[in-house]
Amino acid sequence: MAQEQTKRGGGGGEDDDLTGSTAAGQERREKLTDETDDLLDEIDDVLEENAEDFVRAYVQKGGQ
């Protein structure tokens, strides 16, 4: 049984843009985290108010 390994080179020489994209990536990550937390809080509120209907609707839509 033979196995082949392929090595791929990176972008090469684009390290100067790394700090700018890292800061932008961090900002985007924080924004997405906040949005996700808000969405999860909203789901928690719905489940606290009416979990039975939520589960019933989920099962009717084909959930398992």
UniProtKB/Swiss-Prot annotation:
The keyword Zinc does not apply. The keyword Coiled coil applies. It comes from the Bacteria. There is a cross-link at Q64 (Isoglutamyl lysine isopeptide (Gln-Lys) (interchain with K-? in acceptor proteins)). Pathway: Protein degradation; proteasomal Pup-dependent pathway. One of its GO terms (molecular function) is protein tag activity. Residues 21-58 are annotated as: ARC ATPase binding. Is modified by deamidation of its C-terminal glutamine to glutamate by the deamidase Dop, a prerequisite to the subsequent pupylation process. GO terms for biological process: modification-dependent protein catabolic process; proteasomal protein catabolic process; protein pupylation. Keywords: Coiled coil, Isopeptide bond, Ubl conjugation pathway. Residues 1-37 are annotated as: Disordered. Residues 23-52 form a coiled coil. The modification Deamidated glutamine is found at Q64. Strongly interacts with the proteasome-associated ATPase ARC through a hydrophobic interface; the interacting region of Pup lies in its C-terminal half. There is one Pup binding site per ARC hexamer ring. Protein modifier that is covalently attached to lysine residues of substrate proteins, thereby targeting them for proteasomal degradation. The tagging system is termed pupylation. Belongs to the prokaryotic ubiquitin-like protein family. The N-terminal unstructured half of Pup provides a signal required to initiate unfolding and degradation by the proteasome but is not needed for pupylation, while the C-terminal helical half of Pup interacts with ARC to target proteins to the proteasome. This is Prokaryotic ubiquitin-like protein Pup. It comes from Mycolicibacterium vanbaalenii (strain DSM 7251 / JCM 13017 / BCRC 16820 / KCTC 9966 / NRRL B-24157 / PYR-1) (Mycobacterium vanbaalenii). The gene is pup.
